[in-house]
Amino acid sequence: MKIAVRGGHNFKAKGALGIIDETIENRKVYKALIKYLNIAGHNVIDVTPGECDVNTDLYLGVQKAEDNNSELFLSIHFDKAYDRYEGALGTGTWIYGRGGKAEIYAKRIVDNLSKGTGLKNRGVKENSKLYELRKTSMPAVLVEVCFCEATEDVRIYREKGPDLIGKLIAEAINEKEIEENIKPEGQEDSLKEKFLKSTNTKAIANLDPRDNPSSIYKDLGEIYKGERIRVLPEICDNKDYLPIIYWKDTTNIESQKVWVSAKQNYLKIDTNATVINVVTELDARYIKSQRSSKMGYVKNGERLYVHKIESGYALGTYFASNGYKTAWFTAKYISLD
């Protein structure tokens, strides 16, 4: 079955905030849901938009589901009713109206979540005003995992974890237990570990992976604050964007080349080298030649990340004014750590 899955809200149009943050937690749950639906053999479409206002967020999510002719739409949320609540409020699902496939899926989901976690079962409720339910042509279910401010809900959620929540939702759709693919012990971890060892940059804010280095782009996913990525070893004279690769948890593979913001308030590039013995400045060049035109420069004592050294030149990513660039530098003026 072709299933559209959406993580509710985004970090620009944030969701509920209580003991836990809805936007942060539903990103964990929806990724787990996608993982288990994929394992079960479903064709899963991630319809979670990037950072945008609430109306755009809702529109893009539904439109992508429609454009892909999805057969089921699932949206993951966390609820909130009070500033703080001592006790349990529970898990529930919302549908547009009674009597269709959406109600069947919604009941299976809420029952399985409650049974599998111990969360109070709030049942299936109707709401014909919610955008995701009234604008979708396929059966649609909005899942409220639990209440952000309810102490017992949060205790259970933290104890059980987002991976189990995603698994229980997927198994409710699948109508049978889903087992993770059996692979040699440690194989998947080693793939990710190998990638992480090759990274050279930390995201210090949430990033949109773009298909091109401009403000008009296709959003290819989500890179969250704190994630490690790899800036690619290629010449880049665009202080607004850098070419990178990131790890896609939902499919457990490296991404293809994408572009992200190169601004210093979005990225923190690792450094492994220092500029030395420079009297004035060291030119950043487009090619490995003294005849190359000048991209920019670095000064004595500046730090940068060197990707490789070839023919007496070091390819390095450096901070240029208000964004990072990658260029060739005369290697004898670069001291590796």
UniProtKB/Swiss-Prot annotation:
SUPFAM superfamilies: Zn-dependent exopeptidases. One of its GO terms (molecular function) is N-acetylmuramoyl-L-alanine amidase activity. One of its GO terms (cellular component) is outer membrane-bounded periplasmic space. GO terms for biological process: peptidoglycan catabolic process. It comes from the Bacteria. Pfam families: Amidase_3 (PF01520). Disulfide bonds: none annotated. Coiled coil: none annotated. This is Uncharacterized protein CPE1502. It comes from Clostridium perfringens (strain 13 / Type A).
